[in-house]
């Protein structure tokens, strides 16, 4: 079987999620400190047990997917007294563990595919987790960009567009290994194989593919291969400005996919701070900022604005202390209003994160999700029925 057939027919779990007007995902805090270099009180933990509780509860509440980021940091992480992100677990292994604890929710793993991976390895590992989960696994393809990370693996840093040339060949081979019934031999520009074969195949033909590119080369790659594309506000964390800037960005991505006879969906990452009153929500926002670890915050901020990631150039230091791409602060009604506006701006989904994950997730489930259903953003648990 070749790649000529539309890839969309293979995406049953994602298509079920898309029965909702707004796809709903949860970022998992698999690194110490999660998204916020702050010492304001919270119980968030990087441990597998804590993240398993988050994933299981998200599934019970009707979330469509959970997602873990990947990173490679030296001793002490981003530093500071809190040693921000000194500990981080591997998302591929975490999602493999979650496959045994969940039944319906999509499990997305982030993998830096250029840090020594061969497509055959990842095709086999991915197909295995996909079968373990009943067809619910997806891959977030990351090329890497930090000089220090490449050096950890004994590699020279690679030029930005060249990374996506490598990723394009890697992903093409990956898809062939999942989709084709014959052994594959390849003498490629970057990878070689002889009589390579993967069995069992992913349950739905091939696994869900995700990417968070924003540059020209990155988006060209993403619309060719990805089913779900993370978009980043090009104007920073202010949701008012984001909702004004996102429509042409989302339209450009979807138009690019349509030219290739493909369908892609876009999803954005809001950090949600929700309380009964607006005053309480902004008080929590202030507490996170007031208790920031200044050394960790500085290092975290400089890492992103100093790299070649086009999407983060407008981010402020305050944004990195709070975490997430856009900041949604307010009452349950206000949060839902922002979700509606993000939907109107062309986003097909939101991938939320919190400061104090389990209690904030529970509050979100009890207070925000019912309003999302009332607003027509969510169809309820029926979208997840097997």
Q: Model segments located where?
A:
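Glycine-rich, proline-tolerant flexible connector loops at the mouths of alpha/beta enzymes
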Residues: 65-89, 113, 233-246, 352-365
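Hydrophobic faces of well-ordered beta-strands that scaffold small-molecule active sites
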Residues: 22-26, 66-68, 107-109, 137-141, ...
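Active-site mouth loops of central-metabolism enzymes
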Residues: 34-49, 110-120, 156, 203-216, ...
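Conserved, mostly hydrophobic/aromatic
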Residues: 24, 58, 62, 98, ...
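Hydrophobic, small-residue-rich alpha-helical packing segments that form membrane-like cores
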Residues: 7-13, 25, 40-41, 98-106, ...
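N-terminal beta1-alpha1-beta2 module of alpha/beta enzyme domains
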Residues: 2-101, 201-207
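Acidic (Asp/Glu)-rich catalytic clusters
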Residues: 16-19, 59-60, 96-104, 126, ...
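An alpha-helical appendage that flanks or caps ligand/catalytic pockets
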Residues: 3-30, 59, 160-203, 233-344, ...
